[in-house]
Amino acid sequence: MNAPDRFELFLLGEGESKLKIDPDTKAPNAVVITFEKEDHTLGNLIRAELLNDRKVLFAAYKVEHPFFARFKLRIQTTEGYDPKDALKNACNSIINKLGALKTNFETEWNLQTLAADDAF
């Protein structure tokens, strides 16, 4: 089979970097960021969060081939707002939302456990 070994989907090779940022020559104030060893899960999450930012004019990603864990994210922002800053802000927002989700989940889990213990 032509599919790569499973471990190649998440382990970076020697000298391989997680991100590569290139300016997008087709649009002003835009970059193309290549994420290695990541897939639709992260691509769609970041794209959706970027589109919540009013200063982001365009955000999209594409996975070039399903066998390879790599996607390209294109970000275009308003003038005076660096696309790298938009990415940092989106990632920080995602981290905060996941932290809140974890807290809410743990609270509900503890309440359910307590209620189940009281039932006996």
Swiss-Prot record:
It is found in: Nucleus. It comes from the Eukaryota. One of its GO terms (cellular component) is nucleus. Keywords: DNA-directed RNA polymerase, Nucleus, Transcription. Changing L111P: Transcript termination readthrough. Pfam families: RNA_pol_L_2 (PF13656). PROSITE patterns: RNA_POL_L_13KD. Changing L114P: Transcript termination readthrough. One of its GO terms (molecular function) is DNA binding. One of its GO terms (biological process) is transcription elongation by RNA polymerase II. DNA-dependent RNA polymerase catalyzes the transcription of DNA into RNA using the four ribonucleoside triphosphates as substrates. Component of RNA polymerase II which synthesizes mRNA precursors and many functional non-coding RNAs. Pol II is the central component of the basal RNA polymerase II transcription machinery. It is composed of mobile elements that move relative to each other. RPB11 is part of the core element with the central large cleft. Seems to be involved transcript termination. Present with 4280 molecules/cell in log phase SD medium. Belongs to the archaeal Rpo11/eukaryotic RPB11/RPC19 RNA polymerase subunit family. Component of the RNA polymerase II (Pol II) complex consisting of 12 subunits. This is DNA-directed RNA polymerase II subunit RPB11. It comes from Saccharomyces cerevisiae (strain ATCC 204508 / S288c) (Baker's yeast). The gene is RPB11.
